[in-house]
Amino acid sequence: LFLLLTVSSLICAQIPAGYYYQAHGKTGAELKTALHNIIKEASMLKYGSGEGATWEGFFYTDQNPDGSVFDMYSNETRYFNGFNGIDGMHIEHSLPNSWWGGIKNNAYKDLYHLYPADATMNMSKSNNPLGEVSGTPIRDNGLSKMGKNGFGNTYTGNCFEPADIYKGDFARSYFYIATAYEDYASLWNSPMMQNNTWPVWQSWALQLLMEWNKNDLKSTREEERAEAVYKIQGNRNPFIDYPDLVDYIWGDKTSTPYPFPDETEPFLISPRNNKTLDFGILLQGDNKTIDLDIQGKNLTETLNLYWKTEGENSGLSLSQESVTANEAINGKTIHI
């Protein structure tokens, strides 16, 4: 039996109050891991087309006002047809899924690095790394290019180079994947990556991504897309919220805690939103009690507690159905 406990509050609006609280005071690799623990849980759409799948996500995340598809891979104009796939377009893993063995896990379905892409350029991109093309491109469609990498002198194989106006978008997608899925460290198989949780990136790749992140600042469209993904998945991309986080995780400020804004709005430290409690297997007549710690910050009103279950006769009860602001601030344990 699983229980979803929801605490009613007035907390909402873009970056929720306290969302990054558990990352406060952390530096370098510890900061990255703290962010991993914050963003790793998400509700993913299934992969593919149709209702409840990737193309429904794209309908909300990558649709221009005129109904056309926002395509970072080509200048071709194509239009949405409901939640159906679109001829001439692919669901593109910007960080190739073969880099973690092609396992169809959450990263395979994560909209923060999935994009609707021109099929021809996507097939040319294949599973090549990002880079900056030197010499005559293998393919150039006027927006994206494929060819030999000329960035640095470590990796000289084929690479995919997006347009300058999208390089930061790709960099922030890559930083997100390396953080949200840092537990995939042993799976990484890429010219850009190492098999560790930090620093993750080969030195040339890290330099490339950091330069792209710095030179192509986040746009309003990128922010709006991230908010649309957040509404679907329930987790955020911290590198869009705070692009300079990369300096504190990988750059010249790794010994300095990131200066997150002061928290002035009310929020819960525990439990996190959508926390699930596992009662295990219970037989008829069994009794079991689970403790749940509640703690908040900047609270001024009483918290009302309730649960959502699929059946009306759940047999569940709470030791109390409300917690005062002072109780929550000081920390309160309730019994379920």
Where in the sequence are the language-model features?
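Domain-level detector of nuclease and nuclease-like folds
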Residues: 84-90, 95-263, 277
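Surface-exposed binding patches on compact interaction domains or structured appendages
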Residues: 266-278, 297-335
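Long, structured ligand/cofactor-binding scaffold of large enzymes
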Residues: 81
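Core beta-strand segments of extracellular beta-sandwich domains
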Residues: 279, 287-297
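N-terminal module-boundary/linker segments of secreted carbohydrate-active enzymes
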Residues: 13-78, 248-249, 255
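Sec-dependent signal peptide recognition
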Residues: 1-4
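N-terminal signal peptide c-region/cleavage motif recognized by signal peptidases
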Residues: 7-10
